[in-house]
UniProtKB/Swiss-Prot annotation:
Matches recorded under Pfam families: PetG
Coiled-coil residues: none
Family assignment from sequence similarity: Belongs to the PetG family.
Membrane topology: Single-pass membrane protein
Record protein name field: Cytochrome b6-f complex subunit 5
Subcellular location per the Swiss-Prot or TrEMBL entry: Cellular thylakoid membrane
Superkingdom, natural source: Bacteria
Gene Ontology MF terms: electron transporter, transferring electrons within cytochrome b6/f complex of photosystem II activity
Any one GO BP annotation for this protein: photosynthesis
Provenance organism: Prochlorococcus marinus (strain MIT 9301)
């Protein structure tokens, strides 16, 4: 029996966390490799 509030919090935080990790990783990759020949 999962509480709806807890379930909602988890379902709300997981995509935000994944998006934040993806954005930070993409920015680091673009900053590090963007100077080669990736326009």
């Amino acid at each position: 029996m999962i509480e709806p509030l807890l379930c909602g919090i988890v379902l709300g935080l997981v995509p935000i966390t994944l998006l934040g990790l993806f954005v930070s990783a993409w920015n680091q990759y673009r900053r590090g490799s963007g100077m080669l020949d990736i326009d």
